[in-house]
Amino acid sequence: MESALNQEFQIDFCVKNKKLLKILANVLIASWLSFVVFLILGCIAIDLFRFDLYSQFFFNHLSTLSALAWTFFVLAILFGAATLAINGFFYKEIRKKSAFKEDSK
């Protein structure tokens, strides 16, 4: 009886871990893609700000482009920090479940 319960727990644990790892992988991919996209958009905004300084359109919208560039860089940093925080949380949860599994043996 005890062996059957232990086996059921192990199967349940593996299934939940796979779901957790799949969620983690999706979150990491989305976060890093967002980080890269915002970083690229920030670089593009700064390039436009720097190289087209004498163009009348960009001269009139200089502060807007500067704010846009800084906004994209801040968003990139926030997404990077969120990725690290989510990584740490999921890693800690997986470690807790692994320790619980070893203790139950």
Curated annotation (Swiss-Prot):
This is Uncharacterized protein MPN_086. It is found in: Cell membrane. It is a multi-pass membrane protein. The chain crosses the membrane at residues 26-46, 66-86. The keyword Transmembrane helix applies. Its main location: membrane. GO terms for cellular component: plasma membrane. The keyword Transmembrane helix applies. Keywords: Cell membrane, Membrane, Transmembrane, Transmembrane helix. It comes from the Bacteria.
